[in-house]
Amino acid sequence: MFHLGWFLGSGFGIQPWNPAGGDGVYTGANMRDWMKPDLYVDLAASLERACFDYILIEDTAMVEDSYNGSAEVSLRRGFMAPKNDPMPLVPLMTQRTKHIGIVPTVSTIQYHPYLAARLYTTLDHLTEGRVGMNVVTSVTDRVAQNFGYDQHFDHDERYKMAEEWVEVVKQLQHSWDVDAVIADDVNGIYADHTKVHPINFEGKYFRSRGPLNTIPGPQRDIPVVSAGGSVPGRELAARHGDTQMAMCKTVEDMKAYREDIHRRMLAHGRKPSDIKLLFLATPIVAPTDAEAQEKAEALRRYRYTDAAVEYNLWNMSYTSGGRIDFGSIDLDTPVDQIDLSKGNGERSSIANLFQDTEGKTLREVAAESFQITDLGLVGSPDTVAAKMEEIMDEVGGDGFLLYSPMTRHSIAEIADGLAPALKRRGAIRDGYTYTTLNENIHEF
């Protein structure tokens, strides 16, 4: 069996709302209601019925203005903004569910480790052990400037900072011994003070005395999720990750990625089974194979439209950390002439976008290259389920992190079409053995 997760790629932000902008005809009331909890609560209930492990909620705290030197496109089309803080949404998403995990993103420059440790421990209690933390370093200078920095740290230094951040959080999570809470109402003793300890951490980036003033939650150690595919990002996952989002375009890339992470884990004294790698994919599902192929062809044609090219150029600018304005580059420029080294953002994502693009122009890359691909998962539910099983058999595991436009129609295609087909094949779980996210991730 393999695992399934859902990537809520727009975070607690505006969801697909614009049929004229390529969002399709099933956008419903997203434009008016994206900031209300109902859509997300329904998502959690649907995906628990489908037996997903977790929902990963993207987040970033800025209004992007590097594309054409303006926030005009970002705000006109709703790219990355507006967006709400996902943390208050987490307990709401667990109210109609009992098992599925909710993994909000936390940035190591936005949250001090003490604040994060206290917040996630609180969420661990409120969700009864179903929260995880998606640890990111943030991408752009604009995020850093919103939190008091002149500009963002260089890429590799961000990950050194993140390593230290995770270490502080983990020490704080263990600042209460497992038997520190006595809860003796007869003798009037709540906790044993000798079993609650300062951590007195002093590092290059963070200092914290501790202890936490919250008691350990059901999981105690909140599962760590990460997404970085660069060498420092892989090292972070190998040292601390419980599950990782992996972005690959081919089965060969997936196998190589998994083998590399496992080698790094062994070097850090961890077992490869300690982490579950979920590969990003956008399956294209329809009632029949022919209809799915028609959807895929329509999507391919749309990618050459001005609206789609504008989005991809905008996304490239953002992904570079806001350091390269792809809107200012002539579309007929050969990509070999573009200096990508100036970027300071998602290094592996930029590499993914420009993989195998030698001899192409920026126009061609903007129309043909996307960070998340379908991995060949195009067809009826049974066809896609068989292909997913085939890929996992070849790669060796551990599962898929599915990304699809956030509409009730697309959710139903996965939860009520694809997932039942996978269950019939015995490819995914048909129920939950445990109640906490940590246990469900590591069950198999």
What are the functions of these language-model segments?
Residues 62-63, 82-85, 92-105, 223-226, ...:
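Catalytic cores of nucleotide-enabled group-transfer and carboxylate-activating enzymes in metabolic
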Residues 48-49, 91-98, 124-130, 266-272, ...:
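Acidic (Asp/Glu)-rich catalytic clusters
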Residues 1-96, 219-222, 442-444:
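N-terminal beta1-alpha1-beta2 module of alpha/beta enzyme domains
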Residues 2-6, 55-57, 100-106, 129-135, ...:
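Hydrophobic faces of well-ordered beta-strands that scaffold small-molecule active sites
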Residues 17-38, 105-114, 150-152, 218-231, ...:
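Active-site mouth loops of central-metabolism enzymes
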Residues 4, 47, 51, 93, ...:
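Conserved, mostly hydrophobic/aromatic
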Residues 1-19, 28, 156-219, 252-259, ...:
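An alpha-helical appendage that flanks or caps ligand/catalytic pockets
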Residues 96-147, 153, 161-165:
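Hydrophobic or amphipathic alpha-helical targeting/insertion segments
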